[in-house]
Amino acid sequence: MNNKLSDFEKNLYKKLKSGKLEVKVSYRTFLCPYCPDNKKKVGLYVDILQHASGVGNSQSKKRSLTEKASHRALAKYLIKDLAHYATSTISKRLKARTSFIPAETGDAPIIYDDAQFEKLVWPWKGVLVNIPTTSTEDGRSCTGESGPKLKDELIRRGFNPIRVRTVWDRFGHSGTGIVEFNRDWNGLQDALVFKKAYEGDGHGKKDWLCGATDSSLYAWLANADDYYRANILGENLRKMGDLKSIYRFAEEEARKDQKLLQRLNFMVENKQYRLKKLQIKYSQDSVKLKYETEEKEKILRAYSEDLTGRQQKSTDHFNRIFADHEKQKVQLESQIKELEIRKLELAKREAENETQRKIVAKELEQNAAINSYVQLSALEQQKTREKAQRLAVDHKMQKEKLHKRIAALERQLDQKQELELEVQQLKSQLSVMRLVELDSGSEIVNKVETFLRDLSETEGELAHLNQFNQDLVVQERKSNDELQEARRALISNLRDMGLHIGVKRMGELDTKPFMKAMRIKYCQEDLEDWAVEVIQLWEEYLKDPDWHPFKRIKLETAETIVEVIDEDDEKLRTLKNELGDDAYQAVANALLEINEYNPSGRYISSELWNFREDRKATLEEGVNSLLEQWNQAKHLKS
């Protein structure tokens, strides 16, 4: 079967070579004689060669064996006999297909033998002969035209050589030269054009071998005969290149292009893989950025709403103050008008009652002379009693706040008050007696002297008690300062020791309820930054002196008025609805502590605290706790 197909293919090749079937239409256009109705029946050399190779290599059962054999013969004819019409744009797929032509499925492939194609010298070389030479004067050597001059002459004729080398032997210029062309498809086309041109005007290789006598240059394309020739020309060709058929050259170029294609495909796949990874990362980053942007917008929106609310409250507060000011201004103007009216009425009444006022003034002057002494005495005594009562009330209030150690001071103060009252009474009685009973005789004088002595003794005792009282006050202040300094030292040393007697920051906000409530409500893990911003916002609220969410109530069991948290406050009510009772209670506790320990400054203060009983610790408890720690540390060291 294979032999019959091979013979059939050879016969078709001979017909094509003999010119019985038209293949070449023009210098650039060719056609397929076996496919008259095919769309590719007319085209460039590359297109027809690709079509013939494709049909010849086809494994489809729709193609008959004769159709495949005829197209393989056409491909062989194009490669062997019309290769000089090839261009440098032969496709990679065509070169790969022309490396071998498989037969039908199940048959052995028919492989082209490289020996059946003409082998040329590669890189492509042309041979120049019959170069004019002249002998030197001594007749020992010959000279001729140089390579560059021959190259310029070929270029003027329309050829495209890259170099022309003249061949020299031991006798000088041999009269031959080697024309070099580019080693690619363009170089091959230039070489074939060079060959055809000299063959066309009767100066080809066959013409030279037939013994031409023309003095012009003869040229042809260097092949295996020239390569293996045993002369100086063959020696130079063997040094400058190798033998290679056009078929083998196309096969090697196809392999190179195939490797390049594989490398490019690998690079494309690698770039696509990296692009896919970058797209995935971009998608993830876009989702994350979108979420963070939404969270940021939410926080900014909440902040803007809160700021707007605070500004609105400030505006409302200012408007209320301004309205109250205007109201008070109107009331004040009304009162001024009323006072002016009263002033006019009083002036009128004063003018009408001027006579009566003068009479009353005279009577008052007379009565004043009589009652002045009595009134002055009574007034002095009344002032003394009121002053004593005020002093007693003040000392009583101070006595409730002082420590037990000043009990002696309280007793001395009572004695001082009694003595002062007695002195004032004695002075008042003495003044009255001097004014009323100036003429009472010696008995009154004796009583006065007795009162004066008693008064002098009483004033001495009073001065002694005043000095003793001042000493006690100074000592008490000094002791109180020492106690406060000791308390501050305990607070500094017991800080962050984890004992039941320690330091509590009064008014500090407990953050745990906020974190817990936000995790439960929003069910997200990365809420720390958001929670910190919310906590900082409430810490700023606690420091704001304008925010006072308290109300005054009167206890039922006593007459005392106390301040409690106003549960109807807008901020506290919003906090309770948003984050629950625990966060609300944490803010309420901080407010109560600030209101108790530092209501004016509204900042956090440290206090010695009994955490076990949840109360303010005494100085004695703090000292005992510090001594226990010191004893434990001493025991561990020993």
Curated annotation (Swiss-Prot):
InterPro entries: FDM1-5/IDN2 (IPR045177), FDM1-5/IDN2_XH (IPR005379), XS_domain (IPR005380), XS_domain_sf (IPR038588), Znf-XS_domain (IPR005381). The keyword Coiled coil applies. It holds the Pfam family XH. Keywords: Coiled coil, RNA-mediated gene silencing. Residues 318-497 form a coiled coil. GO terms for biological process: gene silencing by siRNA-directed DNA methylation. PANTHER family: FACTOR OF DNA METHYLATION 3, RIBONUCLEASE P SUBUNIT P38. Acts in association with FDM4 and FDM5 for RNA-directed DNA methylation (RdDM). This is Factor of DNA methylation 3. The lineage of its organism: Eukaryota, Viridiplantae, Streptophyta, Embryophyta, Tracheophyta. The gene is FDM3.
